[in-house]
Amino acid sequence: MIVSLNEAKKYLRVDYPDEDSIIRKFIHTGETLTVNTLRKPLTNTQINKVAVLYVVAYLFEHREDADMNELTKSLRYILSTEREAAF
């Protein structure tokens, strides 16, 4: 994991343990989406951390109404300089 539970909780401003399980799932989802968007293995860089934290925050805030198309477009934009070209 390139983002720890504590980093994610600090980013989300969550101080209580009640949400730990769901935040861990969001971190895993964020890393998976980041790898899929990058089209290469995940490395521990600042831009990749930002991307994972963006996904975590988006999913945390939009649990009931997450628009995965919007999320994916934003993630592509964030990672555009790192993304492998595909033909």
PLM features: what roles do these ranges have?
Residues 1-87:
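Divalent metal-cofactor coordination and adjacent catalytic microenvironments
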